[in-house]
Amino acid sequence: VIIDFVKGHMGGNTITILDGRQLPDGRELEISLAVLDDRYLCSHEAGILYPGEEGCDLTLRIVGRASRKFISACGGLTQVLGKVLTSTGWGRRFALSVHVGSTVLLGTPAGVTPILISGEGADFSTETDMTQFLGEIYQQGIEPMVLDGSRSWRVGKFLVIHADELRKALPGSVAENLDESARHKIVAMQEEFFLKSPQAGFDLALYDDHPVRQGNDLRVIFPHSIPKNLIEPSCGTGSIAVCIAALADGFLKVKGSSGENAALSLQLESGGGYDLGGPDVTRVTLVPGKGHRMEEAFFSHSNVEVTCEGRASLA
């Protein structure tokens, strides 16, 4: 099988995009997982594109390397896709003309996901509407948990851990560097998470509220599967989950000039290597609804690149 691909990243979250029309029926998952493997394109997620249906511009299926299955959402993929559609010929491949001001409607398993293209000249950026994923979180529920003796939150399918909980349990650990003791602790908590939560998946976020640069709110990293060395320096869905957990835990407050119902704009330090935080910024906007729930969610990332384009040959 010979398939065209384009690869990129969002702050180190590596993404490969494939043309689904080139994949044999019934082998989409198998081939995508092979492409994600270190022997081929070494990526965290794959996006399989098809022409749009039911009013959407594109239909998107998503494969996660950590979970080894189709998944409902991937924010990093939508950010890379925005860059791909504005800087390569893949927009024309699907008969799309994408420019500043365009809104591209993606048909995903989570529902219609709009991405808005903005910028000046050739410098494009993408804002992803994550409201459908936010709804998935609330549908699956949010709850505090005690795992391996430490507090955490289940936010939908995500396990969200505040790094201070690792510091309390491991006084000698440098948790922000994900040292050996911190990794063992995270693995133990995740193993208990799998036992206790039917919603559990390979979706894990570590954060704290000790940013190193003024104007930022949180630091994040996403060690989805430490035993498999699958650690994402940035993650769109994980960033939304972190903000929901931080609100629930009281580390963030909804505030603004419009009062309690003002949109909450947050900056998360991310990207770079396998440390908590990083040189990039993930921007999250949450719009409050009724009660204590958020009604809408949006995000963008400061560092999105297309890294290569070509063809892959697989057996």
Predicted segments, located by residue:
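A glycine-rich beta-to-alpha transition motif near the start of alpha/beta enzyme domains, typified by
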Residues: 1-139, 149-315
